[in-house]
Each structure stands twice: as structure tokens, then as C-alpha cells.
Design a protein with these regions (language model features):
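Membrane-proximal basic amphipathic "stem/tether" segments
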Residues: 1-69
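S-adenosylmethionine/decaboxylated-SAM
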Residues: 67-77, 82-248
């Protein structure tokens, strides 16, 4: 697995260099000013993107991708997008969104699924986030806001409390793994954990997404099922995993 990961990184670097070189060549055709600045930017960007620490971070993130076996994904649904996903989630349910930001997706959860109770969990690092949530959802019924760390929030609720939750926080392997473990017992048997950014390697600023690794590892270790994935071509995908009916 380590060899395949290293080969993947080598190919990724090669492809990026090829595309960037092509871009540089195209910019010269249009007499773009400060072409030396463009060259400097890409050279510095690639230097930061592919240092040894980034290589290791990406490898650590993808090393668990083969945890799953076929029985974990049998019957998995492909769903067009995450709004269509909401249409298939349980209605009149006890729900949480973990990672609310300004509340736009929470508003869609509320409108589409008509929850019995909707818990909105976020540290709300900036005032504008909480102000936006209050503006959009503050007058809605059956909504409770929790300004708390996503992992620690699991301690707030009783076991088997939620029908389903949706996670959209910092997308790292470590945080996602901790969130899944924190909320696993809080989900009713047969209930769901869903979340955003279900892919693996993001190259923005050398940042490695680890949601897929964390989800696959959790499913395999706890014998859950990968219930559904979304297929957005221009937006990050979502996942749904299901807790076994006989698991407390």
C-alpha cells in the first residue's frame, strides 16, 4: 500500500507540473504582465505543496482507504446531490448538523426533512456565523443551538438519541475519526451518520482531506454499512453510513 501511495504522489506531482507549465505557456500568448511573478508564484506554491511533511500527511490520509470489504458497500445508493440526499433521509426525526457555519445547509435540512428536533452544533468562531444562523433559523420551532466543539458535543446527548446527523467540520482524518467515535453511541440502531467532503486528497495549500479514510476505517471497525454517496461533479460529495439494527 505504501508503494502505491508513493506512486500516486509521484504521478500527482508530474501531472500538476505539466498543467502548470501549460498554463504558463498560455499566459505568454496573451502578453500578461509580470510573468516573472507568475513563475515565482507557481515555483513557491509547488515547493510548499510538495514538501516531505505534505507527502507524509497525504500518505497518512489515504493509507486506510482499503479497509472496506464488499459486504460493507453492498446495496450502497448513488444519489445525485446532497439536496436529493435530504429528500431520502428520515422525516420528523431527531437530527443534528455538526459544523453549521452560517446556517445555509441547516436551513435546507429544516425545510426538506421537517425534523422533530434539529440541533445545530458549532464553535461559531466568528460572530457573523452565529448572527447569520439566528437570522435564518432563530424564529423556527424545534431548533436548539449548541456553541461547543464538535467532538466534545457528543457528551451533551444521551445514547441512542439521534435518528441521523450530518457532519461538515474541518474535513481532516483526525477530527472526522474523533467525531464519528464521539457520536456513534448517540445514534439509534438503524440510524445514520452523514457528512460532507467525502473524498480524499485536496491540494489547496497542500491540505489533505481525510474524510474518506476516517469513514472507511470507522465502518470497517464497527461493522456499519456505507448506505449512500452523492455524485456532484462540481461540488464536494457527501456520504451516509448506517448503524446496524442490532447494535446499541
Amino acid at each position: 500500500m505504501q508503494e502505491s501511495a508513493e506512486e500516486f504522489l509521484k504521478q500527482l506531482k508530474k501531472d500538476l507540473h505539466r498543467y502548470i507549465d501549460a498554463f504558463k505557456e498560455k499566459t505568454r500568448d496573451f502578453k500578461v504582465g509580470h510573468i516573472e511573478d507568475i513563475d515565482k508564484f507557481f515555483d513557491e506554491y509547488l515547493g510548499k505543496l510538495f514538501d516531505s511533511k505534505t507527502d507524509q500527511r497525504i500518505f497518512d490520509s489515504i493509507k486506510n482507504l482499503r479497509f472496506l470489504e464488499q459486504h460493507h458497500v453492498d446495496g450502497c445508493k448513488a444519489i445525485l446531490d446532497r439536496i436529493s440526499l435530504l429528500e431520502q433521509m428520515p422525516k420528523n426525526a431527531v437530527v443534528a448538523e455538526i459544523g453549521v457555519d452560517r446556517g445555509r445547509f441547516a436551513e435546507r435540512i429544516y425545510e426538506v426533512t421537517q425534523p422533530q428536533k434539529l440541533h445545530l452544533i458549532d464553535i461559531f468562531q466568528f460572530d457573523y456565523q452565529l448572527n447569520s444562523v439566528n437570522s435564518i433559523l432563530g424564529k423556527k420551532e424545534n431548533i436548539e443551538i449548541h456553541q461547543v466543539n464538535s467532538v466534545e458535543a457528543g457528551n451533551v446527548f444521551d445514547d441512542e438519541y439521534f435518528d441521523w446527523i450530518y457532519i461538515d467540520t474541518d474535513h481532516t482524518y483526525e477530527t472526522t475519526k474523533a467525531e464519528l467515535n464521539s457520536f456513534a453511541d448517540k445514534i439509534k440502531p438503524g440510524g445514520f451518520i452523514s457528512g460532507h467532503d467525502y473524498f480524499q486528497v485536496g491540494i489547496s495549500n497542500g491540505f489533505s482531506y481525510g474524510v474518506m479514510s476516517a469513514v472507511h476505517e470507522f465502518v470497517a471497525i464497527n461493522n456499519w454499512k456505507l448506505y449512500a454517496v452523492t455524485l456532484e461533479p462540481l461540488e464536494n460529495q457527501s456520504f451516509v453510513i448506517q448503524k446496524p439494527d442490532n447494535q446499541k
